[in-house]
UniProtKB/Swiss-Prot annotation:
This is Small ribosomal subunit protein uS4. SMART domains: Ribosomal_S4, S4. One of the primary rRNA binding proteins, it binds directly to 16S rRNA where it nucleates assembly of the body of the 30S subunit. With S5 and S12 plays an important role in translational accuracy. One of its GO terms (biological process) is translation. It comes from Actinobacillus pleuropneumoniae serotype 5b (strain L20). Gene3D superfamilies: Ribosomal Protein S4 Delta 41, Chain A, domain 1, RNA-binding S4 domain. HAMAP family: Ribosomal_uS4_B.
Amino acid sequence: MARYLGPKLKLSRREGTDLFLKSGVRAIESKCRNRLDVAPGQHGARKPRLSDYGSQLREKQKVRRIYGILERQFRNYYTEANRLKGNTGENLLVLLEGRLDNVVYRMGFAATRAEARQLVSHKSIVVNGRVVNIPSYQVSVDDVVAVREKSKKQARIKASLELATQREKPTWLEVDATKMEGVFKRTPERSDLSADINEHLIVELYSK
């Protein structure tokens, strides 16, 4: 599947917020030289007033880039979220949070979601004792996600676990850093997730 391979900071500047595409070793503001709120390009300093559609599109692009998902797959997630009972926007975020690559990132086994996706694809992750190499695999409540035994010596995983101590720990996950494994304890609630995401704009966009 095609993936964006260009500068990660440019995407964060495009959306005007940290998309958590980098490891976090250095503050993103220092990398952008305090220009995070300035869009890339010659006319980046000019902030056009967005229409309702423009705001909806930007929000969708922001969330899609945070989770590293292409448009077609993102739309499929929306369709599934709309089919489920409850709030469509919240359902969408829950589905995205349940992706195996995202869970691996949240548990601290990878410094970024892109790195987590690579670990999964390279068969370094097991779910309930079985190797799963599909990044989009949906993790269920009580599933045990762990680093494969022969991958536990990887320096990048150890470094990621060290970095994870500086991040807020998700309350819906239980992680044993020493064993390099964790449990998906419960489905995250909206209050558990980023307040910087306005999922209602995405619902409005796709509802047209």
